[in-house]
A protein has these predicted regions:
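Conserved catalytic core of nucleotide-sugar-dependent glycosyltransferases
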Residues: 76-147
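Residue-level marker for beta-strand->alpha-helix junctions and adjacent short loops that shape enzyme
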Residues: 13-15, 73, 100-102
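Short beta-strand-to-loop acidic/aromatic patch adjacent to the donor-nucleotide binding site
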Residues: 63-74
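Active-site nucleotide-sugar/metal-binding loop of Leloir-type enzymes
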Residues: 51-65
């Protein structure tokens, strides 16, 4: 079986932190994975940047997998290995880390809440999102949406 290949992508505003880039380089050098390409979009309209990168990857794809790293997150070879070792094209074609936000941004002490959700049906025949909280520790779980 041929070695699976990977592309890495991120968006930024024109600059990235040294810790972010050190994490990217460490993953590339220490993972033993064949990286096909790095994809980067610079700008200040994050939704448009993300669309541009994912469209380019789909249309010009030369890798089996895409690793998307937010440019304000530091990834380590150990964290990457946890994601990589749990990939499965049939059962888990998308694996996400957990990001946090808050429901009370105006409070002096914000409570971090995971941006992990499941879809729920509503009375009108549509759907909604329900936050998955609390999260189990150190486990992969199936969710409807993350980010």
């Amino acid at each position: 079986m041929a070695q699976e290949t990977l592309s890495m992508a991120w968006c930024d505003n024109g600059n990235v932190d040294g810790k972010f880039m050190q994490g990217v380089v460490d993953v590339m050098l220490k993972s033993g994975i064949k990286f096909e390409t790095l994809l980067r979009s610079q700008g200040n309209q994050i939704a448009r940047q993300r669309e541009k990168v994912i469209s380019y990857w789909y249309e010009n794809n030369k890798s089996d997998w895409l690793l998307w790293v937010d440019s304000d997150v530091v990834i380590s070879p150990e964290k990457f290995k946890l994601l990589w070792d749990n990939r499965d094209i049939e059962k888990r074609p998308i694996i996400s880390g957990v990001y946090f936000t808050t429901d009370t941004p105006e409070e002096p002490l914000m409570i971090p809440m995971p941006t992990v959700f499941n879809f729920t049906d509503n009375k009108d025949g549509g759907f909604g999102l329900t936050r998955v909280h609390p999260l189990p520790e150190n486990k992969l779980i199936k969710v409807g949406a993350a980010g």
